Curated annotation (Swiss-Prot):
It is found in: Virion membrane. Induction: Expressed in the late phase of the viral replicative cycle. The chain crosses the membrane at residues 10-32. It comes from African swine fever virus (isolate Tick/South Africa/Pretoriuskop Pr4/1996) (ASFV). Residues 49-64 have a biased composition (Polar residues). It comes from the Viruses. This is Inner membrane protein H108R. The lineage of its organism: Viruses, Varidnaviria, Bamfordvirae, Nucleocytoviricota, Pokkesviricetes. Residues 49-69 are annotated as: Disordered. It is a single-pass membrane protein. Keywords: Glycoprotein, Late protein, Membrane, Transmembrane, Transmembrane helix, Virion.
């Protein structure tokens, strides 16, 4: 059975777009429709993931790949530590003293 709700919604939206000439109303309707499509798509993807009948095939490559994969939420910045220490001792956010800078010969 085909779900007729999206078709009905599309017909109503097209009718409103034809009869309405205001841009703000049109943009509101378009944003509501896109939100509905995004939410509906995410919901169906989640349903598909929760489906017990379609078990994903596992092999050693995918298991080792998923085991070796690191999360993208935390990026280590240890390589930046020496530069930050140098900048901290050199610039205003550290203990910068303009009078401790070497004076060039011949500079007035």
């Amino acid at each position: 059975m085909v779900n007729l709700f999206p078709v009905f919604t599309l017909i109503v939206i097209i009718t409103i777009l034809i009869t309405t000439r205001e841009l703000s109303t049109t943009m509101l309707i378009v944003s509501l429709v896109t939100d509905y499509i995004i939410i509906n798509t995410q919901y169906t993807e989640q349903q598909h993931e929760n489906n017990t009948f379609s078990m994903p095939q596992k092999n050693s490559f995918s298991e080792s790949y998923n085991k070796d994969k690191k999360s993208n939420t935390h990026i280590p910045y240890q390589w930046l530590a020496p530069e930050l220490k140098e900048a901290e001792s050199k610039y205003w956010w550290g203990n910068y003293d303009p009078h401790s800078e070497p004076v060039l010969a011949g500079a007035s």
